[in-house]
UniProtKB/Swiss-Prot annotation:
Cysteine-cysteine disulfides: none
Subcellular location: Membrane; Golgi apparatus, trans-Golgi network membrane; Golgi apparatus, trans-Golgi network
Region (Disordered): 1-27, 48-80, 114-134
Keywords: Coiled coil, Golgi apparatus, Membrane, Phosphoprotein, Protein transport, Transport
Species name: Mus musculus
Any GO molecular function: identical protein binding
GO biological process, one term: protein transport
The protein, known as: Coiled-coil domain-containing protein 91
Gene behind this protein: Ccdc91
Cellular component per GO, a single term: trans-Golgi network
Function summary: Involved in the regulation of membrane traffic through the trans-Golgi network (TGN). Functions in close cooperation with the GGAs in the sorting of hydrolases to lysosomes.
Amino acid sequence: MDDDDFGGFEAAETFDGEQGGNQAVSPAVPWATFPAVSGVRLSPASPELILDHDHSSPSTGHLPPDAVISSADDTHADSSLMSQTISKAQIQQSAHTHLNIPLFPLGLTDEPSHGALALEDEPEGPGVHVSNSQLRQKISSLETKLKASEEEKQRIKKDVESLMEKHSVLEKGFLKEKEQDAVSFQARYRELQEKHKQELEDMRKAGHEALSIIVDEYKALLQSSVKQQLDAIEKQYVSAIEKQAHRCEELLHAQHQRLLDVLDTEKELLREKIQEALTQQSQEQKESLEKCLQEEMQRNKETLESAVKLEKEAMKDVITKAVGEERENLEKVHAEERELWKTEHARDQERVAEAIQAAVQEQQRMSQEAVKAAIVEEQRRSEKAMEEAVKRTRDELVEYVREQRRLDQVTRQRSLSSLELFLSCAQKQLSALIATEPVDIE
């Protein structure tokens, strides 16, 4: 059994095996020596199972293997849909972050003058080493899965950014297309103006009656054409603005609802996983401590009896008397250590429970604040972009309508002045013809 599961006895020295023939000096009484006993060593706590409290790596947070594996399987099962993939990846990352709580092994400490004993019985507990190796393998596999989940989250984040860029490109293309349509309408209007000017020149060459009829038709056609074009352009811009605003509202509503669902799901999963982890950890610690205490008491008793027996046979009468006194002192020290250990154990349990509760509350608060800030920022950006697009489109439309009206007014004035000049010339010619008719008759 690995004595480092519960911290071991720190600041102790190692007793070598009997084959080497070495003897170890007692840390409490330097002049009392003991022969080495097989299976007993003094060593510091093993660093393999001690979790560093200040370590910031994701591998320091240990969850129950079943809970983490089930959450990873759930994440990969729903990866076909974009929204579900995002929510699952966020839930898994948040659960990994919130449960990143280092658990300290419980160690049996003593005063600096005495040290402590760390017992390791490798032949009697092979099952514990197997379970420790399996636990290390599970932890490594869980770390690999968490790294894969982190990569999946980064990939999804890049996809979301690319989608937002595509959305902005499409919006720019839409505005550019509308500008091109406006330019084409202006070109068509100029073509109609040129065509109407040419027709006006042709009408000037025709007779007075045909000219008046054509002028009336031209005026009506010009007014109806300009009015239809203005109405069509105005309807197109209004419909485009309404569609864009409706689309932005739908996107904002869907995003808000999705974030709320993700937050609720994350809270529920974290609550269940934390409760399960605390229950399982408490049960495991209780069972392991009881078993460790029984085995340790038995080993201490056997070790002390064998050590005293060998020491009595090998040492002189004076050393034998000293060993007896040392044995009594050790029993008193063990009793005191046992009382100190019980007090320290209760104190450590209270500290661990308080630390876990404080960490869980802090992580929940930070997660809620981050999600709320992200929601508010995204809403503000979307509303600002929508307002700017609507305002810019409205200003361009108003400017275009004003320009068209001004051009129509100028063209109408020119046409009327030209028509008035033509009519005055025609009237003068008719007057001249009427004046010359009596002379011809005479």
